Amino acid sequence: DGDDYKFGHFRWSVPL
């Protein structure tokens, strides 16, 4: 869905 996920100090976007 292209949503940005924030996990601790990590951040990435899911191209689904």
Curated annotation (Swiss-Prot):
Gene Ontology molecular function: hormone activity
Keywords: Hormone, Secreted
GO cellular component terms, A-Z: extracellular region
Localisation per UniProt entry: Secreted
Protein family membership: Belongs to the POMC family.
Protein name, per record: Melanotropin beta
